[in-house]
Amino acid sequence: MNEIDQKFEALAAEIRGLREKEIYYRIRKHFDQVPREIQKSCMDFFNQFNYWGRLDPEKGVYEEIEEKGQALFAHMEDFVWLYHHLGDYRSKKTLYAILNNWYRYDFTTTAQAKEYLFDDYFDLDLVSCSTEEVVVDLGAFTGDTVLSYLKNYGQDCYKRIYCYEITPKIFALLRKNLEQYRDIEFRMKGVADTEGTMFLVSNQTSASANTLGQERGEEVPVTTLDQDITEPVTLIKADIEGFEQKALEGAKHHILNDH
């Protein structure tokens, strides 16, 4: 058993032995031990983007800690299962680093797990390609990920690319930036687990963090990958502000049958 295996098993054993409220208070204790400047950076990030809820101890707001504590308590067995089914050391270290950060606010291990050799998403040792690749980019933004794909793998290394983006102004930039490339489908739709209509929720910090919600506003059609793409899919990249799991559930047929 290597070092990361040992650390992961120890973390899992500790969390398994705690009640949900005990996990919550231990996370709070670990946060209190973090240097003040890092605390402020964390609070600014959580409160701006609201991925895990807000964090403002001076006002008694600990939503971020509550939600992560609930996730660790409810899903530790799922995380253990996932860890033992990962096929490479880097992925296991990354999972351990994430969970350890949730529990202990340990940023050292997350920094060690960050991959610097390759561009984001495209580890050439893990992700290969062929001329038959059908790539789906969920949250395509201005086309930066597609351009990175083309740089890393070449313009002949795909059959078709599907780009999904929900913000009209960003969608226009996406089309402009990628219009010179062949066989790219542009779809101004949200992607989830069911078809329907939702509403654009703008993020004041960055348009890249715009998301979907139920409150009235600018309507956005929502689809599923199983309904919207009929050909086999080989690669899905998803950065859609908390809708990733729903998008994967809506791609269940592709995931089960295309690989």
What positions do the PLM features span?
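Phosphate/nucleotide-binding beta-alpha loop and adjacent structural elements of enzyme active sites
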Residues: 1-259
